[in-house]
Curated annotation (Swiss-Prot):
Designated name of the protein: Replication restart protein DnaT
GO BP, sorted A to Z: DNA replication, synthesis of primer
Disulfide bonds: none
Compositionally biased spans, kind Polar residues: 151-168
Length: 179
């Protein structure tokens, strides 16, 4: 395990316990890195150095300027709901299926146990944006339902797992085996 030592003065924990006043008095910056089992355990700091560090922290926590911005610069205006275009339209980035999409999909014969994930919707939109085809809103929803059904069928009907997640090992030892 790598670690970074923040002072050039290093001492073992046994030496610090033996005579901590002398160790801290000899330190150049008022701080000593204390090692236990050849690994940094903690830092020992003189009261004067601790006062300096606290004063520095307090100084840095104060704003550097007394200029305050109006609250209007921090508040984002609420996005107006996107109206569904009439007639046929090409897929666009902000397209969303209806709120009762799962129920509608069931009426079309596509039973979705879980709602459509943001990743599934993004992949669908990206694919059909590139295609440039035009369909009615209801047709887009039917295509989304079928697309999600097909993509999930290869994974037992569940959304695909995140490929970046790290699996956790099973530490349980079955009966009859030694651990």
């Amino acid at each position: 395990m790598s670690s970074r030592i923040l002072t050039s003065d290093v001492i073992g924990i046994d030496a610090l316990l033996h005579d901590h006043h002398a160790v801290l008095a000899k330190s150049t910056g008022g701080a000593v890195a204390v090692f236990a089992n050849n690994a940094p355990a903690f830092y020992a700091v003189t009261p004067a150095r601790m006062a300096e560090l606290l004063a520095l922290e307090e100084k840095l926590s104060r704003p550097g300027s007394d200029v305050a911005l109006d609250a209007q610069f921090y508040e984002e205006p609420e996005a107006a709901p996107v109206a569904i275009p009439c007639g046929k339209f090409a897929m666009y980035p902000a397209w969303q299926p209806d709120a009762d999409f799962q129920r509608q999909a069931a009426l079309w014969g596509v039973a979705l146990r879980e709602p459509v994930t943001a990743e599934e919707l993004a992949a669908f939109i990206a694919y059909w944006q590139a295609e440039g085809k035009v369909f009615h809103h209801i047709q887009w929803q039917q295509k989304l339902a079928r697309s999600v059904q097909i993509s999930r069928s290869s994974n037992g009907g569940m959304p695909q797992r995140d490929i970046n997640s790290v699996s956790e090992p099973d530490n349980h030892i079955p009966p009859g085996f030694r651990g």
